[in-house]
Amino acid sequence: MRSFLALLCALGAATASAQPSTVPADGGDIVITPLVHASVQVEHGGTVILVDPWSVADFSSVPPADLILVTDDPGHHLDPEAIARLRAPGVPVVVTAAARERFGDGTVLGNGERGTFAGVAVEAVAAYDMTPGRPFHPKGEANGYVVTLGGRRLFFAGVGECVPEIQALEGIDVAFMPMNLPVDRMRPRPVAECVKTFRPGIVYLNHYDQTYATWLGTREGDPPPDRQDTPATIRAFAQALDGEGIEFRDAAWYPPR
């Protein structure tokens, strides 16, 4: 309980950090930098991986990627402009079958398939929804990814709910999990219960401010006001994990309004 109370104090006293954090690994630390929404940069041993790069992020300090992973086909996951900016010639871009229709210069991994790209082992994990609603992700159209770096396994869930394929994951060291707000799927406690099924050492929440993300993609009109319930939902997630031995790292995934 003491660790949870300390976390609550930290959440209340400061804004979440978008600064890089590290994970010990063979051959040196893995450096993780949240960018925006579902977009994240991972570096290890000189290799740079970008997941769902999106042009609304500040790329001024983002190095060219050695590998790009795309989890879904909407613009906040698949952004050809961002890929072109951050991709050197010949750099592999791993996409879903649905994304291939919008981005022809990518390598498709279907759910459950594996491959090695830029020397990095990648496994595609099914990402889909089971609860009706909009948006809805049918099975087979989106991917999560397990990436192995320095003996560590990192899981990027992308989109979707806590499907059996996620619950069956083993040996995950770091997980990035979506919390879809205001869509009534993957609320904080269900996300926490999902995390408990496969027990990563560290978990990040991302992909949670859908209303603001939609505005970021269009810039039409004034930005929506801050969601007053976002800090409370993040605290609810942290509370649901209290005592589980899973480290929750809060991060700033969105630019200031």
Language-model features, listed with the residues they occupy:
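Proline-aspartate-enriched helix->loop->beta-strand connector
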Residues: 172-176, 188-211
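Structural recognition of the beta-strand scaffold that forms the well-ordered cores
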Residues: 34, 48-52, 69, 94-95, ...
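Bacterial N-terminal signal peptides
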Residues: 3-14
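Binuclear metal-ion centers of metallo-dependent hydrolases, dominated by the metallo-beta-lactamase
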Residues: 107-115, 201-257
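A short acidic, amphipathic alpha-helical/loop segment
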Residues: 81-86, 165-168, 189-194
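Core dinuclear metal-dependent hydrolase active-site scaffold
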Residues: 19-63, 108-170, 252-257
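Charged helix-capping and loop-helix junction motifs
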Residues: 138-141, 187-194, 223-231
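Active-site metal-binding motif and surrounding structural segment of the metallo-beta-lactamase
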Residues: 55-98, 170-176, 199
